[in-house]
Amino acid sequence: MTGPEWAHTRGTKVGQSSRTPPKVAVLLGGPSVEREVSLSSGQACAAALRDEGYDVVEIDAGHDLGARLIDAGPDAVLNCLHGRWGEDGCVQGLLEWMGVPYSHSGVLASALAMDKQRSKDAFVAAGLPVVPSVIAKAADVRMGHVMQPPYVVKPNNEGSSVGVYLVHEAANGPPQLSEDMPQEVMVEAFAPGRELTTTVVGDRALTVTDIVTDGWYDYDAKYKPGGSHHVVPADIPADIFDLCMDYALRAHHALGCRGVSRTDFRWDETKGAAGLILLETNTQPGMTATSLTPEQAAVTGMTFGKLCAWMVEDASCDR
C-alpha cells in the first residue's frame, strides 16, 4: 500500500525535501497526564519554528490524529507530546506506518525508555550504574514496605515526576498511594545527593546542569517558575562532569535513541565517582520556558529556534 503523496521515502531527512519552506506539524497536548506540559512545549516550539521560517501547523493529538495529519500534509512532524501514547512508541508507530518523517526516537527506543524497569535492564547491560528496584503491585505497596526505606515509588511508565512518592528512612508505615496509580509500580532504592542532568543532541552530549531545589524535585519543581534553580554548566569536579557526559551518551546508545534525549543522575559527592547514579533517560525532554534541554543548548551556542530547527531537519522514518 502506498502512502499519501506527501510521504517521504523511508530514511529521507526533511532537509532533502523539495518543498520550501518545509511544512511542519507540531504534535502537542494529547490525552496523557502530562498534557499541560506538552501544550507548553509544543506552543513554544511552534512559535520558534515560525520565527525560523517554517510553515507550521499545531495539532492537538487525539483519536483522529491520522486523519488530521493527512489533511495537514506535513513534510515532517515535531513530536512535542509527553507521557503515554506520545512518547512510548504509539505515535511513532503511526508515523512510521504513514511514512511521515518525525523527530526524536523511534518505536523501540521510545517504548523501552518509557518502561523504567526494562530501560534499567538495558543500562545494566551497558555497564551503567543504577540503584536496585523491583516491580510490585500497588496494593502490596500500600500494605507494607516492599523494600527497606528510604525508597521511591513511581509509575513504571510515566514521566515528569508524575505520581512519585518518596518514603523516608524514618517512615513507620507504607506509602498511601492514590487510587489513580497503576496496578503495578516501580519501587526503587532512594539515591541521595545532587540532581544532575545531561542532554544529548545527535551524537553529542551538551553539558551538565546541577538542579538546585529546596526539597524533592517533583512536578512543580520541574515546571513552575521558581520551582528550581539551574546551575549550568554544573560546578562539579571535572571527573564527575565527564562521567555525566559519557554516561548520557552511552545511555542514549544503549536504548537506541535518536535525535534529542536527556539523562538524569543523582550524585552523592561523599562517594566521589562511585556516588554517581543514572536515574533515567527521557527520549522527549521538555521544551518549555523553564526546561533544561533548551537551557543547555543555549550554553553551547544553540538558540532555542536553532534547536527546534535541528530536530525538524533531523526528522526521518525508520528511527
UniProtKB/Swiss-Prot annotation:
Gene3D superfamilies found in the cross-reference section: 3.40.50.20, ATP-grasp fold, A domain, ATP-grasp fold, B domain
Enzyme class label: ligase
Question: What Pfam families does the database record attribute to this sequence?
Answer: Dala_Dala_lig_C, Dala_Dala_lig_N
Q: Which PROSITE patterns match?
A: ATP_GRASP, DALA_DALA_LIGASE_1, DALA_DALA_LIGASE_2
Q: What is its EC number?
A: 6.3.2.4
Looking at the record, the residues that make up the ATP-grasp domain are: 120-313
Compartments, as annotated in UniProt: Cytoplasm
Q: Where does ATP bind?
A: 147-197
Ranges for the region named Disordered are 1-23
GO CC terms on record? cytoplasm
- Provide one Gene Ontology biological process annotation: peptidoglycan biosynthetic process
* Signal peptide segment: none
Describe which pathway this protein belongs to, using the record's wording.
Answer: Cell wall biogenesis; peptidoglycan biosynthesis
The prosthetic group or cofactor this protein requires is: Mg(2+); Mn(2+)
Binding-site residues for Mg(2+) 1, renumbered to this chain: 264, 280
Which reaction is recorded as catalysed by this protein? 2 D-alanine + ATP = D-alanyl-D-alanine + ADP + phosphate + H(+)
Where along the chain is Mg(2+) 2 bound? 280, 282
> What GO molecular functions are on record for this protein?
ATP binding; D-alanine-D-alanine ligase activity; metal ion binding
Which keywords does this chain's UniProt record carry? ATP-binding, Cell shape, Cell wall biogenesis/degradation, Cytoplasm, Ligase, Magnesium, Manganese, Metal-binding, Nucleotide-binding, Peptidoglycan synthesis
**Cofactor note as given:** Binds 2 magnesium or manganese ions per subunit.
Q: Which family, according to the similarity comment? A: Belongs to the D-alanine--D-alanine ligase family.
Its annotated function is as follows:
Cell wall formation.
Q: Which NCBIfam families does UniProt cross-reference here?
A: D_ala_D_alaTIGR (TIGR01205), PRK01372.1 (NF002378)
Q: Know the name of this protein?
A: D-alanine--D-alanine ligase
Instruction: Tell me what gene encodes this.
Output: ddl
